[in-house]
Amino acid sequence: MTTPVCISQAFMDSFHAHHAQLLGKRVWLACSGGRDSLGLALLCRTLFDQGRLPFLPQLIHVNHGMQAANDEWAQQVAQWAQQHDMACQIIGLNLTHKSEQAARDGRYQAMMQLMNQDDVLILGHHQDDQVETLLMRLFNGAGVTGLGAMREWTSKQAHTAQSPPDVNKPRQRIFLWRPWLEISRDQITEYAQRHNLKYIDDPTNVAQSPSKLALQTLNDRAWLRSVLLPHITERYPQASEAMARTAQLMQQASDSIDEQVTQDLAQVALAATEQQSVIALDKLAGLSAPRQAALIHHWLAPYPNQLPPSKRLVDEVLALSFRQDSNHQTCLYFDAGSEQYQVRRYQNKLYRLQHAYAQWLQMMPHQIHLPLAHNAEELSLNLADTDVLSLKQSGLEFDWQLTGVRGLMAHLARLLNSADAKVTPCQLIFEPLPRTIKLALAGRSGRKSGKKLLQALDQPSFMRGSVVLCRLDMMGSDGILQDSSTAVPLFIICIDRIWVLQSQFTALINQLLATEVLSTQILEC
């Protein structure tokens, strides 16, 4: 079998493997003008002309402005695309003085701004790139997932630059497709030479004198390619194939671990939203130490493309989870790249909170007065058009909403009206939970206030600034509030639930909650 057939067969095998995922999607090809990406573009053109490939990808070239020749390269790619009747988009950037990783991230972000949701980007990464990626991650102490290196098909999400993000628009996601991961650089070189492909050689990708270490003049990947790997393959000729096979085995092992973690997480998770996730420590303790570590590793950075936590952070979280003293005030901070998080413990629960959300929790709710005026002949409600009440000031990153306010007030007004035709005017008041008022939770004995009440509400210390009391206050005929003895506490609103208080309206509030007429939620603005 000749080299060109190997290359085209590898591409078609990958195409058939991901045919269902490609259906209905627009396909792009990242083309630097180098041997790998230009060879891939030529192959796509050939397969399309032969009727074997049902689409012709659109080329994207990023002119990153880091070298004097970049403008010339962009022009060369555009001319090649025109000659081969392939659409091509040139993106201009200035990534001068950026690190290797920052420049790579910048190129991806620029391409994603051009692409639509769920578009596919073909990349020319090959077996030698896979080996370099594996070695770089190995030298940085990566675990099983990291040593899986690059996957043939994976998703990538954009880091949103909008603050606050638009919750009505999902964070952009594209798919990366690498059909040549089993093809070597030498095979691609031979293919390019067979077709007289005039590709670009980036001088920063190789050493001028590979016999020297060139530590100062080469980036990490180029140093591995030009200096270290030639010595390895001289001693072990099959090293590249063996290391690429190791990456595949690591991917399989990582998938197996992920399946186990998913099952374990379903057992230990108490609640999970984008803002916070809670796990039960007694159930976590029932897992073996390796499964505990794997679960925490996944739990700390649960979304695609987030930076994986270090082993040190995982160990610190496990130490916090199982410490025996009563001091649970420790807060661990970490940056997952796309999000910053806090990890806190309260009693036998472990919380992962978005850092911005944790700060928002400390902002006090504002006081709200809703008059409820009625008489025996006519019922009138002073309500806004909306049925939703925001419990904290607007303009913040999150909106804490109480839904069903109109229904609540209508039911209260009818009960009061039917009980006494001459009942005095009333109003609903929502306010931060006073620490001095003793309240009785429905279905429980005794009255509590302050810290004991908050403990009964199962509220962690870091959430106690976001607790609201709803009470019904009676007003005199002159419209002035009477003394506090005429107030009827109805319920307490916490971040995650509503607690009903003992009153003559307990049955009504319970019914509204059971039918989900009355509910609370937090939205990201």
Curated annotation (Swiss-Prot):
InterPro entries to which the protein is assigned, alphabetical: Rossmann-like_a/b/a_fold, TilS/TtcA_N, tRNA_Ile_lys_synt, tRNA_Ile_lys_synt_N, tRNA_Ile_lys_synt_subst-bd
GO MF: ATP binding; tRNA(Ile)-lysidine synthase activity
Pfam families assigned to the protein according to its UniProt record, in alphabetical order: ATP_bind_3, TilS
A Gene Ontology term for the protein's cellular component: cytoplasm
Catalysed reactions listed for this entry: cytidine(34) in tRNA(Ile2) + L-lysine + ATP = lysidine(34) in tRNA(Ile2) + AMP + diphosphate + H(+)
Compartments in which it is found: Cytoplasm
Keywords tagged on the record: ATP-binding, Cytoplasm, Ligase, Nucleotide-binding, tRNA processing
Catalytic EC class: ligase
Chain sites annotated for binding ATP: S32, G33, G34, R35, D36, S37
GO biological process: tRNA modification
Superkingdom of source: Bacteria
Keyword Plastid applies: no
Disulfide cysteine pairs (residue numbers): none
CDD domains, A to Z: TilS_N
Gene3D superfamilies referenced in this protein's UniProt entry, alphabetically: 1.20.59.20, HUPs
Known function: Ligates lysine onto the cytidine present at position 34 of the AUA codon-specific tRNA(Ile) that contains the anticodon CAU, in an ATP-dependent manner. Cytidine is converted to lysidine, thus changing the amino acid specificity of the tRNA from methionine to isoleucine.
Domain comment as written in the entry: The N-terminal region contains the highly conserved SGGXDS motif, predicted to be a P-loop motif involved in ATP binding.
Identification of the protein by name: tRNA(Ile)-lysidine synthase
Species of the source: Psychrobacter sp. (strain PRwf-1)
Species classification: Bacteria, Pseudomonadati, Pseudomonadota, Gammaproteobacteria, Moraxellales
